[in-house]
From Swiss-Prot:
This is Succinylglutamate desuccinylase. InterPro entries: AspA/AstE_fam, AstE_AspA_cat, Aste_AspA_hybrid_dom, SuccinylGlu_desuccinylase. Transforms N(2)-succinylglutamate into succinate and glutamate. The active site is at 219.
Amino acid sequence: MTKSLFRQSFLTDTLDVHIDVAPAEQVLSNGVKLKLYQRGVLEVIPEEYTQETKNVIISCGVHGDETAPMELVDSIIKDIESGFQKVEARCLFIIAHPESTLAHSRFLEENLNRLFDEKEHEPTKELAIADTLKLLVRDFYQDTAAETRWHLDLHCAIRASKHYTFAVSPKTRHPVRSKALIDFLDSAHIEAVLLSNSPTSTFSWFSAENYGAQALTMELGRVARIGENDLDKLTAFDLSLRNLIAESKAEHLSKPCIKYRVSRTIVRLHEDFDFMFDDNVENFTSFVHGEVFGHDGDKPLMAKNDNEAVVFPNRHVAIGQRAALMVCEVKTRYEDGELVYD
C-alpha cells in the first residue's frame, strides 16, 4: 500500500500548525493522483483525464468557523485514498483559512469573502489569502474549457434559516446557471437558490466572472465546531457531491429547489441605522407589502413586494456596506440550457 500524504487526514494535518506541510504527490493503486500543494490545498486527478473531464473546485473554510463542509470534504478524501470513492472529475479541494478555524472565528481581520474583486484593499491576513486563492484558481483552470469548470464554495449560515440549506448563484457576464448546475442542486436537496442580480466580491463570483465557472456559494446548515455538526441533515448533498466527483448519476430522488431573485440590496448609508427585528431573525423571513422593518437615517425601510424576504441581515455593518439582501420567489425557465426569469 502506498504511503499516505497525510499523517492523520487532510483536515487534521491542515489544522495542525505544529507540523510543516510540504508539497507532495501520491499515485493510488487505481491510477488516481493526489497532489498536495500547500497547507489546505489538494488536487485530485483521475486516471483518465480528457478535454471533456470536469474541473471542479470544492472550497470550504473561507469563513473559518463554518466547519461542516470541512468534515464532509475530509471524509470524501479519506474515501478517495482508500479507493472507495470513484474519481472521474479533476478536483481541487481547498480549506481556505486554517488559522481562523483554529481561532473558532469567522475571520481574523477582515471578511475574506469580500476580497475577490479588483479593488484596492488594506493589507490584512485575509487579503494575502485571497491573493493566493486567486492564483490557485487561475492555475487550476489553465488550459481547460470553460464548460468543464465548476466551483462549489461551501459555507454554513451564522443564523437560523427557513431553508436549512440554500445556494447563492452569482451574477456575471457569463452563462453560469446551467441546467446541469440546477440539477445538481435538486439532487443535493438544496432547498433554495438565490439568483444574484449584481456583481459581488465573493470567491464563487470570482471564478464565475473571470473563468465562466458554474459556481455557487452554498450555505449548508448552521455554524458549529468540528465534531458538533449534524452531518445527517446533509446526506443528500454529500451523495450528490460524491456523484459529481465520480461523474455518476444519482440513485436517489431529486427535490426541486425554490428559486428566489434578489429584489434589492440594502446598503447602510447613515450612522442612525437599525432593523426592527432581532439579530437572530431567520434568513428568508418575509414581510407583507408596505411593512416597515427598519430605518436608515430618517428613511423607513419597508417591503416593496408582497412576501419580500430578508437574507443575511446585519445591522452592525460599516456605512457603505451591505446590510441585507431582499429577495422574492420567482418563476424560472430554461433558455439555451440556462436558467432565466422574467
